[in-house]
Design a protein with these regions (language model features):
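Long, highly charged, low-complexity intrinsically disordered interaction regions
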Residues: 4, 56, 62-80, 90, ...
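Single-stranded RNA-binding regions, centering on S1/OB-family and related RNA-binding modules
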Residues: 543-717
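Generic start-of-chain signal for non-secretory N-termini
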Residues: 1-20, 27
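A glycine-rich phosphate-binding loop feature that marks nucleotide/adenosyl-phosphate handling sites
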Residues: 182-189, 319-323, 377-379, 402-409, ...
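Structured, non-catalytic alpha/beta "coupling" segments that mediate domain-domain communication
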Residues: 74, 88, 99-102, 226-239, ...
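Short, ordered loop/turn segments at secondary-structure junctions
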Residues: 38-40, 129, 239, 321, ...
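Duplex nucleic acid-engaging cores and interfaces of nucleic-acid transaction enzymes
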Residues: 50-53, 60-318, 322-423, 430
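Short flexible coil/turn linkers enriched for glycine and charged/polar residues
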Residues: 15-16, 28-29, 95-96, 121, ...
Length: 717
């Protein structure tokens, strides 16, 4: 039997030794970001996505192994565990297969077969099921089991009981279930019909049928939701005449007097027990698969949203639009500190709009506002139009529509109250919107990732699994970027490798009590932050003020000695690194030979390359290499759009059937999957990601339905 490491190595296409090393590191308490970044030699430079896949599968396989032991123990307790059964359980590759093998031994609720066994009909059932050549005719065999005291009045009663027992035995056969399950998933079809006469968003599925292998995840989730709301009735179809021959081949033995009786028992087993059970299993498996796909897509969409390039160092105005309570306004400086707040009412009429423009213009001039961030919620359109009007008198100021999802939840929560105790709840959301433009990652980590809203059907998914996946993405992003130890909030620090909510708060408390951290080493004085946590977190925390320039890089303290040796070897010093005067470091290393230099300074080649990269750009932010967000000074109206126009936009969401693009008209346009590119793709994420800047051609505009159809593939380069 293969070990877990061997199974994972085969699935991931990695050497067994690398997989074993990763398992050992995980078991020692190392985090995925730490392993991905600082233990490359031990796993061949697997990326964080592969490592998370490995971790997920490791958990599944360990649960599978645990369940195998539980099942064997339970069967052994009944005195029925054989060598063959042990081998079958040990080689079962999925939890479903283990449960199939356990099924005959599982304590069941009272079934028709249980009642028949209580009437003493088990021997008759076994006699007929054996289908020996000398087996008597069923009617004759049944005579011996007539017993009115037990409720078996006639031979027909005895045969009915025997049939019930045989049907259950057939239904509990693991090989039969596996074969029919495979047939259903290959050849089955899912059908949904209207359960109501009223129109609804599920009208596409009012008369829908599709082969199971061809079903898209978004179709499964939509059908599930429609069924849950009582608007759809759903069935799984499988050609009975295709399934029964496979079942008969496994059970029926030709030439026996019991053959026809067993054929009938097969049909009863299929119709009454096997098919309803497999239909439930198929629906569950389809839902699980669709959920995993949707969670994966949510994670894929979340990552670029978190890694949006910051627009730092500029005074920014945040506008949280609204009707009843007006438009909330906050002005923050280049570090995110609040300078001013107010409320204006541009939607209350022309006079109030003029007053709002005058008030905001005065604020912009007073504080030297460079950028305006407008939330994309209620009244955003009117607020954007007012802003554009205002900017005609403010040259050099630009604006951007910011996704405000989760801002209201955050502003009303405990975290915002702790951060801004002196500000009204409504004004806190305006501060958050302004900060989202300045540093999206630092602000978005304060919000439950599910509330950011870049997925499909996220409320229908298993929430624990969704949380795990999304928190993993946030963790990967935070650690990939790195965190300033002296300015980061507890929310941001909490996602750093090796830290948790408690140690993150302790860092902030220590900083407030003792002043800025002079270097990384001082972290060891923080309560509850021991050597293991320090090992895991130190490399991801930056201290720009430190006397040691390496404290402002991604070089881990364990590699400081190697970095210093490398600098000496290349004739450079700390000051050269600080001044950015080591541009030719990689060339020097390559000229000397990477393997030779790595050996000389005592690290592996992957670590050497990372150290060189960090020394060449201390304090670098990987987000600065990504396309900058589009800042606008003017706005288009939907009525301005004409088919054939080519516009530049930002990808806001990527889902199974297409891509939503913000083209500056307040209503996102849809690029259907068929219009994403000229070649065939299974999913738009093969081509684009959230945050990408793309050129699109306007295909159609429906003002009544607020729909804009776009194409990427028809844009001529």
């Amino acid at each position: 039997m293969q070990s877990i490491a061997q199974i994972l190595a085969s699935e991931l296409g990695q050497p067994v030794q690398y997989v074993e090393n990763v398992i050992a590191l995980l078991d020692e308490g190392s985090t995925i970001p730490f392993i991905a970044r600082y233990r490359k030699e031990q796993h061949g430079s697997m990326d964080d996505t592969t490592l998370r896949k490995l971790e997920d599968r490791l958990q599944y396989l360990r649960n599978l192994d645990k369940r195998r032991q539980e099942v064997k123990s339970a069967i052994d307790g009944q005195g029925k565990l054989t060598e063959a059964l042990t081998a079958a359980i040990d080689s079962a590759a999925t939890l479903a297969e283990v449960e199939d093998l356990y099924r005959p031994y599982k304590q069941k609720r009272r079934t028709r077969a249980t009642v028949a066994r209580e009437k003493g009909l088990e021997p008759l059932a076994q006699l007929l099921l054996a289908q020996e050549k000398d087996c008597p005719a069923p009617e004759a065999a049944a005579q011996a089991y007539i017993d009115p005291e037990k409720g078996v009045e006639t031979a027909a009663d005895a045969l009915q009981g025997a049939n019930d027992i045989i049907a259950e035995i057939i239904s509990d056969d693991a090989d039969i279930r596996k074969a029919l399950r495979g047939l259903l998933m290959r050849q089955g079809r899912l059908r949904s019909l209207a359960a109501t006469e009223e129109d609804s968003v599920y009208r596409l599925y009012y008369d829908f049928e599709q082969a199971i292998p061809k079903l898209a995840g978004h179709q499964i989730l939509a059908i599930n939701r429609g069924e849950k709301e009582g608007l759809l009735s759903v069935t799984v179809l499988l050609d009975r005449e295709a399934a029964l021959p496979a079942l008969r081949r496994a059970v029926v033995k030709p030439g026996s007097a019991a053959m026809e009786f067993i054929k009938a028992a097969c049909e009863d087993a299929y119709d009454r027990l096997i098919y309803p059970s497999l239909e439930r299993e198929a629906r569950s498996a389809l839902t699980d698969s669709a959920n995993e796909g949707a969670i994966g897509q949510f994670a894929l969409n979340l990552k670029p949203l978190l890694l949006q390039p910051p627009v730092k160092g500029h005074v920014t105005m945040g506008l949280d639009p609204g009707y009843a309570h007006g438009c909330k306004v906050a002005v923050i400086d280049g570090t995110g500190k609040v300078l001013d707040t107010t409320v204006v009412y541009p939607t209350y009429g022309e006079r109030q709009k003029r007053e709002a423009i005058a008030k905001l213009t005065a604020l912009c001039k007073k504080h030297g506002v460079a950028h305006i961030a407008i939330g994309n919620g209620t009244a955003s359109r009117e607020t954007e139009q007012m802003t554009v009007e205002m900017l005609r008198g403010l040259p050099g100021v630009s604006y951007m529509i910011v996704n405000e999802a989760g801002a209201s939840v955050y502003s009303a929560g405990k975290l915002a109250a702790e951060e801004f105790p002196d500000y009204d709840v409504n004004l806190r959301s305006a501060i958050s919107i302004a900060r989202r433009l300045q540093d999206p990652l630092a602000e978005l980590v304060k919000i439950d990732p599910k509330a950011i809203g870049v997925g499909q059907y996220q409320h229908d998914m298993p929430q624990k699994r969704l949380d795990e996946a999304l928190c993993g993405v946030v963790e990967d992003c935070v650690n990939a970027v790195g965190v300033d130890l002296n300015t980061a909030s507890a929310s941001l620090l909490g996602y750093v490798s090796g830290l948790n909510g408690t140690t993150a708060k302790n860092i902030v408390a220590y900083r407030e009590a003792n002043g800025a951290f002079p270097d990384r080493k001082r972290l060891l004085k923080v309560p509850k932050l021991g050597p293991k946590a320090y090992e895991q977190c130190a490399g991801f925390l930056r201290v720009p003020e430190s006397k040691n320039v390496l404290d402002n890089t991604g070089v881990h303290p364990e590699s400081y000695g190697a970095a210093e040796k490398l600098l000496a070897l290349c004739g450079c010093g700390d000051e050269d690194v600080r001044r950015g005067a080591v541009d030719g470091l990689m060339r020097k290393v390559q000229a000397m030979g990477e393997a030779k230099v790595a050996e000389e300074i005592g690290v592996g080649v992957p670590t050497l390359r990372d150290v060189v990269k960090e020394l060449m750009k201390p304090g670098r932010d990987l987000r600065s290499d990504l396309p900058a967000p589009i800042l606008r000074t003017d706005v288009l109206d939907m009525k301005d759009l004409k088919p054939g126009m080519v516009l530049t936009g930002t990808v806001r969401n990527v889902i199974d059937f297409g891509v939503f693009v913000d083209i500056g008209v307040h209503q996102d346009g849809l690029v259907h999957i068929s219009q994403v590119c000229s070649r065939f793709i299974k999913h738009p994420s093969e081509v684009v990601a959230v945050g990408d800047i793309v050129k699109v051609l306007v295909l159609d505009v429906d003002e009544k339905k607020h729909r804009i159809s776009l194409s990427m593939k028809q844009v001529k380069e």
